[in-house]
Amino acid sequence: MNAIQFRYFKGVMTKEPLKTIIDTWYKLRAERDKKLTNIFNTIPFYESWLGDETSIFGIVCSYDNPARDEAVLTKGYRTEDYKGKCVVKPDRRYKVGKDFDKKLQAIRQILKEAPDFSSYSLKELGMYLLVGNFSRLYFSVSGVQDDIYIAKIPVKEQGNFGDDFLEIHECLTEIKESEFLSIQGL
């Protein structure tokens, strides 16, 4: 089994095309947040969601939230304890649950259409790669620290499968892993 090798890069966020990429991403994120807020405003017990930037599994609220008490008493909602909070999920056997599930499905679709910055920026730069071996799959990741864009890109070598390494955008400079870690404060 071949170990996956990585290449590391950095760039300055105030230089093009990184500046345009992050500005565009912020605009897309604002549009996403507005759509989400419109739906969340229709859910009286909403405080946050259980999931991540691309998925939702339920609505999180505090146990002392008065709207949660009403949800518990209404057929169509299921509640679960998660890290000291209440997670409300739909019970699709009832109309209220089916309606709530439609809202969660709409939220899922919005989240799916609005990628995280790492994925978005790498795709815009043509550097989003997947490389694997027999036991694991690795993908490109990126982030920003103090206006420095950093990226970690897997390299396909003999015995591995996945995307071939492409040309690196001219706005990026290759760096060593130690500098990549240092920029992150590690």
From Swiss-Prot:
Name used for this protein in its record: Uncharacterized protein HI_1487
Alphabetized InterPro entries for the sequence: DUF5420 (IPR035360)
